């Protein structure tokens, strides 16, 4: 029998949820009113063939991965939040007395789902939210975050040094358990080894409407055409996205460019005329 996400809690637990949720607005409360997550079960039905007789409800599991993505939580952090954060517990469908799946179960589910599976389900969530008017598309904000690969970074940095003044951002460690990761830049002086999550947020709802994961060495600006389309009224991002190609792309899509422009110093004339 599959454990259901919407558990029947005690009278006190249900009363507690009602009191908390009625006191103030919350993003997850609004999202739950416009998105029906039951479609997840059909997508994940084949995951449970060899999981034994009592697996966790796939809707609950996907919601945990979804919250991890929204709030940038590790598996252990997600387990803790699902156990003690009452808004999270309500969104997940747990009773106030019920404990969530532990971090090892969450990790296995996420691995089975995979990046492509998550993207497929995530896009369906976005479309439901858009169709219900939760997402306005008035202004899209593009940005990226760094994902650190779980590798022996000290050993990798020793190998990475000396490959040019700034190192080789295309360096591949063939013995790494995460061979698709690459060295990238947080700043001119700081590097990291891993991936980038390129995200687009709908400004009015503060909901992430598109995501793309790349190796850490991929420049932010190159990803704008894959993440912004003509549904956006305006798009903005930091100076990393300021290029003539990106401005031209947005214009062709009918999107107003609010990209922050780099400060360009007046160039010196190539030729000086002397009398």
Could you tell me what each predicted segment is?
Residues 28-32, 36, 83, 142, ...:
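Short amphipathic alpha-helical "interface-anchor" segments enriched in bulky aromatics
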Residues 1-35, 41:
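Charged, often Cys/His-bearing segments associated with DNA-binding zinc-finger transcription factors
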Residues 222, 245, 266-274:
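Short, charged, surface-exposed secondary-structure boundary motifs
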């Amino acid at each position: 029998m599959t454990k259901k996400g919407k558990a029947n809690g005690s009278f006190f637990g249900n009363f507690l949820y009602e009191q908390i949720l009625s006191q103030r607005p919350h993003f997850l409360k609004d999202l739950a009113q416009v998105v029906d997550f039951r479609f997840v079960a059909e997508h994940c039905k084949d995951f449970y063939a060899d999981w034994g007789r009592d697996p966790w409800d796939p809707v609950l599991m996907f919601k945990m991965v979804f919250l991890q993505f929204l709030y940038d939580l590790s598996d252990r952090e997600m387990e803790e939040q699902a156990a003690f954060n009452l808004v999270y517990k309500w969104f997940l469908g747990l009773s106030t007395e019920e404990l969530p799946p532990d971090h090892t179960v969450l990790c296995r589910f996420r691995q089975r789902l995979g990046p492509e599976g998550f993207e497929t389900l995530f896009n369906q969530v976005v479309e439901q939210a858009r169709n219900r008017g939760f997402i306005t598309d008035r202004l899209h904000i593009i940005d990226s975050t760094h994902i650190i690969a779980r590798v022996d970074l000290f050993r990798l940095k020793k190998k990475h040094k000396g490959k040019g003044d700034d190192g080789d951002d295309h360096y591949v460690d063939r013995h790494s358990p995460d061979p698709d990761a690459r060295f990238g830049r947080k700043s001119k002086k700081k590097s990291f080894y891993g991936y980038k999550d390129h995200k687009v947020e709908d400004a009015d709802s503060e909901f992430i409407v598109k995501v793309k994961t790349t190796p850490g060495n991929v420049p932010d600006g190159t990803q704008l055409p894959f993440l912004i389309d003509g549904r956006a009224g305006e798009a903005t991002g930091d100076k990393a996205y300021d290029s003539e190609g990106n401005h031209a792309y947005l214009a062709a899509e009918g999107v107003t460019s609010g990209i922050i422009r780099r400060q360009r110093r007046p160039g010196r004339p190539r030729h000086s005329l002397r009398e």
